[in-house]
């Protein structure tokens, strides 16, 4: 445990000192993803305190959506992903199909995490990919809340009050911050998370002109 603490602390210090301050959004997105992945990995391990298959599956979904979505946000902010409007127009439809499949998996197949892991990663990717850079601060804050709620589910499974409290603080603060930013932008969170095809095309065309 001490070795893991030293490795994690050293990596965090190295990450914070080597990157410039202008790259702070990318760092926050990356740390959000790592937090969500950690929660999902803990639940996937065969610990003896696991009691609720539904709660375990919920933790995996929230954690991996936060992880894959944060990786996409990091890559977009860092300029690693190219924008292709031709296939982005179909991402929303594909996301709806994935959500329906995930609901069906929750209902009929509650044993095992293989299907949920794959679906959650794809959902996180498809949900964040169409979103433009102007809305990315809201998305990063929302993903931050996801990582906090994933910690809450781990705390509920483990019966750990400290995890529940800290996860609730992170989740609630991220949710409130997302709401405040949407209100200041005079936009709906649903419109940001689920952008229309026309707005995607308009944004990418204006980005190309600039």
Q: What does each model-identified segment do?
A:
Residues 1-2, 14-25, 40-53:
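Transmembrane alpha-helix boundary signature
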Residues 1-9, 52-67, 109-119:
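Structural signature of hydrophobic alpha-helical transmembrane segments
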Residues 9-14, 33-45, 56-72, 180:
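Mid-bilayer segments of alpha-helical transmembrane spans in multi-pass integral membrane proteins
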Residues 10-28, 70-84, 123-136, 178-182:
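C-terminal ends of transmembrane helices
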Residues 169-210:
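Membrane-interfacial segments at transmembrane helix termini in multi-pass membrane proteins
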Residues 50-64, 154-176:
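Structural signal for the N-terminal portions of transmembrane helices
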Residues 2-4, 23-35, 82-95, 137-146:
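Cytoplasmic-side transmembrane-helix entry/capping segments in multi-pass membrane proteins
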Residues 44-51, 108-112, 133, 138, ...:
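Transmembrane helix-loop junctions at the membrane interface of multipass transporters and ion channels
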């Amino acid at each position: 445990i001490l070795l893991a603490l030293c490795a994690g602390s050293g990596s965090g210090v190295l990450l914070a000192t080597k990157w410039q301050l202008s790259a702070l959004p990318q760092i926050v997105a990356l740390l959000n993803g790592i937090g969500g992945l950690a929660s999902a990995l803990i639940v996937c391990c065969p610990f003896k305190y696991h009691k609720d298959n539904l709660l375990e599956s919920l933790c995996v979904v929230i954690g991996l959506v936060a992880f894959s979505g944060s990786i996409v946000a990091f890559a977009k902010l860092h300029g690693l992903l190219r924008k292709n409007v031709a296939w982005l127009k179909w991402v929303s439809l594909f996301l709806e199909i994935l959500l329906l499949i995930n609901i069906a998996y929750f209902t009929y197949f509650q044993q095992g995490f293989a299907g949920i892991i794959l679906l959650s990663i794809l959902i996180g990717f498809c949900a964040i990919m169409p979103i433009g850079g102007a809305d990315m601060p809201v998305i990063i804050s929302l993903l931050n809340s996801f990582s906090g709620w994933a910690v809450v589910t781990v705390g509920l499974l483990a019966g750990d009050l400290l995890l529940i409290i800290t996860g609730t603080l992170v989740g609630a603060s991220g949710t409130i911050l997302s709401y405040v930013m949407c209100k200041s932008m005079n936009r709906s969170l649903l419109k940001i998370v689920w952008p229309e095809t026309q707005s995607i095309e308009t944004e990418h065309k204006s980005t190309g002109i600039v």
